[in-house]
Amino acid sequence: EIQFIMDGKKYVARNLWMYPLGTIGRDMMYQLFSSFMWTFILLTKGLTAGQIAAVTGIMIGARIFDAFNDPIMGVIIEKTKTRWGKFKPWLAIGMILTVGVIITTFAVDVTGWAFVGLFGAMYFAYSITYTMHDISYWGMIPALSSNPGTRDKYSSRAVLFAGIGSTLAGMLIPMLTVGDGAIGGSTNSGYAWVAVGISVLSLIFICFTIFGVKEVQEDEVKDSSTLVTNKKEAQPVKKDNNGIKKMIKVIAKNKPLLWIIVAFLLQQIGNGLITSGIGSTYIYFQYGFNGGNYSLFSTIGVAATAVLMVLYPTISRNVPRKKLMTILLIVGLIGYAIMGLCTVHFLPLNIEFWVLTAGFTLSNFGQYGIYLVMMISILNTV
């Protein structure tokens, strides 16, 4: 037992690298499918107004579907029992299936209503497959440690590495798909090859988590080792039979979690509008179809958040969470105000671009800081 506890401490140091490395590729996939989907469609498919409306309806329908899909998948994962645990099998299955969905979406060359049909099938499939590995990935944190401080370390480092993946994708995808740097000489071939490349990288990175992470709850091991000295005296612990109804009741009674869910929803809507919709489209149409412009815009904006992710463990020990949320909210609002002023076009175009980028940097700093605080808060309220 003593050796096992010592190994548990060793696993924490290893897990702090193996766990976050796994999400670099996941977030590159997420960026490609979420932030660049509309850009891909607008630049390569030549859809009619009716077809674009159909695509929009599919996206909205998939988001509504997620509201039911996510909790159901959470229960399925929770009930999973295998020799590899309940998280890693779904990590592997979800990643492999998501890779297939992404390559099919970006590499199959169809247009018109044929594309709309393919897109509908792939978009809903993506909602299912990405949820498989996303819930299992973030759900693994409580299984790594029951100590809130240790969980904070896992969460902040995972978000940092997720930011690295997002930054790499945001920097490379525009450069490799639009303009002179497009792989294969066209935007169509550029997106196809980028989808393949990111898919391969995502499978490589997730292997660090699947094969390198050891699920050890140090504190529970210590408690059990001190309280139970005779194995014959140990009694089996009856596990709760969690289901959808019980989960809904638990969430409904957990007021802190309910408020966090509402805040999370609003934060994600705002973030999605700026980075996944308006942001990339506005940059392309206002400043030209040069992939380098959007690469600069997204890279500088996202890179600023890396500072927060690195310093978060220190900040969280010295700044109360409520005060930190207030500061981050103010910073984000200032950034959005600057971006809004840029749409008035009172500056020369080249200067306006850099002012817009500065605004995005501030807004992104606030957005991702709030995301990190809420992510940790959810883990601590469950």
Model-assigned labels for residue ranges:
Residues 1-382:
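Membrane-embedded alpha-helical bundles of multi-pass transporters/translocases
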